[in-house]
Structure formats: C-alpha cells, structure tokens
C-alpha cells in the first residue's frame, strides 16, 4: 500500500499524484494551514508546510513518509490545524 492510498482512505484527507495533500482546516490569508503546497507558495519538496508532532518535533511531508506509513497515518489523523506555512 502506498502512502497516497493510505492517506486517501482517510475520510478527511484528499490527495493527488503530485503529493498535494490537504487536510480540512481553516485558511490563513488564503493558504490552507494543512495544505502541503501551502497555497502554491512552496511545496513538499521545499518544505512549504511543517507539521508539529506530539513530541514537539517538526516534520515535513518527506520526513513523515520516511518514518513509515503506519506512523504517518496515525500522525495525520491527529494533525488537523497543526501545520504552518513557511513561505
């Protein structure tokens, strides 16, 4: 199972083949706080969005994928509102 199919299986997450993953969240200046592409001002490859984990450590999407699909799924399920745009 790929990370995209795992994420797509969650009811509040949508994904595309370009790794643009959006969690439902309030927007800030037109940029979704939990959109990996950060409103087009960045991208997963450039760290356009950062998620803060339960331990306080910050993760980019590639880092979340690197730590494993199971951990990523559990993390994303509880990550609503924790992303921050850094453009």
From Swiss-Prot:
It comes from the Eukaryota. InterPro entries: HssA/B-like_chaperone, HssA/B-related. Coiled coil: none annotated. Pfam families: Coiled. Transmembrane segments: none annotated. GO terms for biological process: sorocarp development. Belongs to the hssA/B family. PANTHER family: HSSA/B-LIKE PROTEIN 1-RELATED-RELATED (PTHR31059), HSSA_B-LIKE PROTEIN 1-RELATED (PTHR31059:SF5). This is HssA/B-like protein 31. It comes from Dictyostelium discoideum. The gene is hssl31.
